[in-house]
Amino acid sequence: MVQKMLTSRGLFLILTMLNLSQVPSIMGEQRWAILSTFPKPMPVRHDAIVFPKFFTTNKTVDLPYLLYDPTAPLGENRSLLEQGSLCFQINGPGNCINLTARALGKFNEHRGWVSTTQDTSNVEITFTNRTFWQEVNWVNGTFLPPNFSDKEHLHQPKIAPHCSLEDEGLILPWSDCQSSIIRWVDQSKTFSFSPNMIDDPEKEFVMKKGLFIQDFRMHPFHKWVLCGVNGSCTELNPLIFIQGGAVGKASFTGISRFAQYWGIHDASQDSYGYTNTSVEITGFNKTLVNQINYPSTPVCVYPPFLFILSNDSFEVCSNDSCWISQCWDVTKNTRAMVARIPRWIPVPVETPSTLSMFRQKRDFGITAAMIIAISASAAAATAAGYAMVSAVSGTKLNQLSADLADAITVQTSASTKLKGGLMILNQCLDLAEEQIGVLHQMAQLGCERKLEALCITSVQYENFTYAANLSRQLSLYLAGNWSERFDETLEALIAAVLKINSTRMDLSLTEGLSSWISSAFSYFKEWVGVGLFGVATCCGLVVMLWLVCKLRTQQTRDKVVITQALAAIEQGASPEIWLSMLKN
């Protein structure tokens, strides 16, 4: 039974191969295949096209939220490069983005003076200390550490408007705005971040010590935008309470110190100037809104992104030192690297196919025939002009020669333009046909062959689009032999025009019956040759048409015989009689 099945399958394979030999097909071409890979997280680099979106696990923070996901061992030994990768660390050495707990505030317009003290012991300098109170929306959470040495002005892709919002009485007044004050977050300068809470450390509004270390005018509740070098950005606001923290609205007490130098002329400050101005927030004055405390809140990412977690360097990762999870809990792991799992990978494979994806492109035969016909007609007109030279009187011949020269000159210019126009038209037709073919192919995209972990599509690997090849072929065609012959024909035509234009007949030689008979015979001989050439061309076309019809009839007959043979195999009968018809 098994032998019979093998024999039947062998005959079926032979008939299938015979059938393939009768019709055009694509054999052994490379196709795009979709390979299902084993999940292996790859670090997200600074030049990645897409950055992940971060989520918090606390709904009350008013930020994007996801449920907490447990951790699992990494399952292998790997060495992950930290520099240039999107990774974070909590107050430790390494090349990841450093995060630290710090207090930041959005200082409102409500402000008042408490007291002022002055030191006038020096005649030229007066030191003034002003104690003030300031209303502020403050947050004690996780942020980038301050950097007093970075004064570089950067630019980020604008994913949100720049704006300043009114105080609406919220405890966490998150805005949908993006700050224009930007800084680098790593020493290799691969990631930029906004808002930079210290724009210029030397400005008088910067608080370098006290409860808040920041620029007095900055707004920490804007979008925390982290961007890579290729314009990919993400928001880090969900990391605010990853170590826990608190938030509230209160009034703080601060001290503003500055010195007045008397006797120094300044156009903007009359007879004195200010230097060494500093602002420092020293402590609470009174609480306006109750403080809200938050525990350590893990941050999560959505698949296909995940975290690779560790408490040591990522350069040496093992199954015991690194873990993977959708969420990062700093109470368990102080370092996290964002990774992405490429679940499906496109790969080129070589496989036989019975699909005829696209019909063959039309060549430029029609264009060449039209151009050659134009050249032939121009040459025939030139020959007719030569023949008519002796058939008319000498007086009219000079005028005819000049008119013929002008006409052929115009036709030469028109033929050159027509050549370029027809080439452009052919290219447009080929490009339109290619686009229709690609749309048809994409509309019917599926698995031509589906294996356990591999889907072989019908999309050709090298010839997915023929547009570039068509343009290249067009350029080669224009520079080929046909184009050279066409240019030679035009040059010969121009030479003939010049020769006709330089022809001047003597009136004494234009009379006589013998000369007229000779010219008439020459004229008749030229047109007889043109007629015979046309008859021969028509006969050749008829013979070619007959051969094509005969070939199509033979192919139709062979397909019917093969179909009958396949039907005989399915019914258990012998297909030998049908195969013998193919041999005959």
Curated annotation (Swiss-Prot):
Subunit structure: The mature envelope protein (Env) consists of a trimer of SU-TM heterodimers attached by noncovalent interactions or by a labile interchain disulfide bond.
Alphabetized UniProt keyword annotations: Cleavage on pair of basic residues, Coiled coil, Disulfide bond, Fusion of virus membrane with host cell membrane, Fusion of virus membrane with host membrane, Glycoprotein, Host cell membrane, Host membrane, Host-virus interaction, Membrane, Signal, Transmembrane, Transmembrane helix, Viral attachment to host cell, Viral envelope protein, Viral penetration into host cytoplasm, Virion, Virus entry into host cell
Chain ranges passing through the membrane: 528-548
Annotated InterPro entries: Viral_Envelope_Glycoprotein (IPR053368)
Extracellular compartment segments: 29-527
Region Fusion peptide: start-end pairs: 364-384
Cleavage, annotated site positions: R362, D363
Source superkingdom: Viruses
Coiled-coil annotated residue ranges, if any: 391-441, 477-513
PTM remark: Specific enzymatic cleavages in vivo yield mature proteins. Envelope glycoproteins are synthesized as an inactive precursor that is N-glycosylated and processed likely by host cell furin or by a furin-like protease in the Golgi to yield the mature SU and TM proteins. The cleavage site between SU and TM requires the minimal sequence [KR]-X-[KR]-R.
Residues bearing carbohydrate: 58, 77, 98, 129, 140, 147, 230, 276, 285, 311, 319, 463, 469, 481, 501
GO biological-process terms attached to the record: fusion of virus membrane with host plasma membrane; symbiont entry into host cell; virion attachment to host cell
Signal sequence residues: 1-28
Cytoplasmic side: 549-584
Originating organism: Mouse intracisternal a-particle MIAE
Gene Ontology CC annotation, any one: viral envelope
Function in brief: The surface protein (SU) attaches the virus to the host cell by binding to its receptor. This interaction triggers the refolding of the transmembrane protein (TM) and is thought to activate its fusogenic potential by unmasking its fusion peptide. Fusion occurs at the host cell plasma membrane. The transmembrane protein (TM) acts as a class I viral fusion protein. Under the current model, the protein has at least 3 conformational states: pre-fusion native state, pre-hairpin intermediate state, and post-fusion hairpin state. During viral and target cell membrane fusion, the coiled coil regions (heptad repeats) assume a trimer-of-hairpins structure, positioning the fusion peptide in close proximity to the C-terminal region of the ectodomain. The formation of this structure appears to drive apposition and subsequent fusion of viral and target cell membranes.
Gene assigned in the entry: env
Protein name: Envelope glycoprotein
Miscellaneous note of the record: Readthrough of three terminators occurs: UGA between codons for Thr-71 and Ala-72, UGA between codons for His-110 and Arg-111, and UAA between codons for Val-392 and Ser-393. This particle is a defective retrovirus.
